[in-house]
């Protein structure tokens, strides 16, 4: 009894008596000694042992329920931003139409209409004269054959005689205005005067000419003779100059014709070479593996040479055309002289020292 009196002060800190539900939730079975002490009205000699520890209580709270027990409550879910937005009507209205909006058609918009009116653009129809039928290369080549065009134009030009040249020179002198009206007659004035006298003499009959000569004195006849000799000399010099100019023009024409003809031949040969190269590429087994090539270079090596050309103010000179004609002929023959001729052309024409 003394022991009970000593511990009486600490009974208020003792764990309260558990209810029947707590005992059922606890898996621990009561100890035999405790039951015996309880039946004997014990517990007087020590503290009553706790039925469950804290860990056991936690495990009991989160354990799955038995098949016969009541269904558990709905598990608690954390509230996130996504779960809040799923129930938001404004957010759903915005996201439902996202990606389904059609792009703006710029051509049919009102802004584009105003833009076109500001630019004032008008469609221009392509004229039929600018449309070429390039289906047939041969026909196009014949249409653009500069050599035949030039030759046909040359054949149509009539050849002038010496008398016609003289008459044209006289007409040019007569039609040309006098730049200065000086008292001293210039050479053109004297030539025009003599030409007029010659024309009057031609028009006059033979009888009137003889009568006029008979009336002249010896001094007047000598003066007329000197004037005629001077006119003949001047006309002869002018005729020689015009004939030399005609020879130069004919030579230039021949050089241009030969250049154009060689250029067309090289272009045709280059086209044939390209077609042959395409056919060779299609073949699986080339013929070059069966035999050796006797030439030091592959056929068509110099045929595709690119000739540099610097565009000047005027047309190329006759000397330049002659050099280019030599290079084109060597290219047509696929000759090994092409590099040397090309070097001379670059040093003499493009980069003269």
Curated annotation (Swiss-Prot):
- Chain positions covered by the region annotation Disordered: 19-49, 271-300
Q: What does this protein do?
A: Involved in axonal outgrowth and fasciculation.
Among Pfam families, the record links this protein to: FEZ (PF07763)
Q: Which domain of life is it from?
A: Eukaryota
Protein name from the UniProt record: Fasciculation and elongation protein zeta-2
Subunit arrangement? Homodimer; disulfide-linked. May form heterodimers with FEZ1. Interacts with synaptotagmin.
Which residues are recorded as modified (Phosphoserine)?
Answer: 135, 176, 195
The Low complexity compositionally biased stretches are 28-38
InterPro entries assigned:
FEZ (IPR011680)
Q: Name one GO biological process term.
A: negative regulation of autophagosome assembly
The gene it comes from is: FEZ2
The leader peptide range reads none
């Amino acid at each position: 009894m003394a022991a009970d009196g000593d511990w009486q002060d600490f009974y208020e800190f003792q764990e309260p008596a558990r209810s029947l539900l707590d005992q059922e939730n606890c898996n621990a079975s009561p100890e035999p000694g405790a039951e015996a002490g309880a039946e004997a009205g014990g517990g007087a000699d020590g503290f009553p042992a706790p039925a469950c520890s804290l860990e056991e209580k936690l495990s009991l709270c989160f354990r799955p329920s038995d098949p016969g027990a009541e269904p558990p409550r709905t598990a608690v879910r954390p509230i996130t931003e996504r779960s809040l937005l799923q129930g938001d009507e404004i957010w759903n209205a915005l996201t439902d139409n996202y990606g389904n909006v059609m792009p703006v058609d710029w051509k049919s918009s009102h802004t584009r209409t105003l833009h076109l009116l500001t630019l004032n653009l008008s469609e221009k129809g392509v004229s039929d004269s600018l449309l070429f039928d390039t289906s047939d290369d041969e026909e196009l080549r014949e249409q653009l054959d500069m050599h035949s065009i030039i030759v046909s134009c040359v054949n149509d030009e009539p050849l002038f005689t010496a008398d016609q040249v003289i008459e044209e020179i006289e007409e040019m002198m007569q039609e040309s205005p006098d730049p200065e009206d000086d008292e001293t007659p210039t050479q053109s004035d004297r030539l025009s005067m003599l030409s007029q006298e010659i024309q009057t003499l031609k028009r006059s009959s033979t009888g009137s000419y003889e009568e006029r000569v008979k009336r002249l004195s010896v001094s007047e006849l000598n003066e007329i003779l000197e004037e005629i000799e001077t006119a003949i000399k001047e006309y002869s010099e002018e005729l020689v100059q015009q004939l030399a100019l005609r020879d130069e023009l004919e030579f230039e024409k021949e050089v241009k014709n030969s250049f154009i003809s060689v250029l067309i031949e090289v272009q045709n040969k280059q086209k044939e070479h390209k077609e042959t190269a395409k056919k060779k590429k299609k073949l699986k087994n080339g013929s070059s593996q069966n035999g050796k090539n006797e030439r030091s270079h592959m056929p068509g090596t110099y045929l595709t040479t690119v000739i540099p050309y610097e565009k000047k103010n005027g047309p190329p000179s006759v000397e330049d055309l002659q050099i280019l004609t030599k290079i084109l002929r060597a290219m047509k023959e696929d000759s090994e002289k092409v590099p040397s001729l090309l070097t001379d052309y670059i040093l003499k024409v493009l980069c003269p020292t």
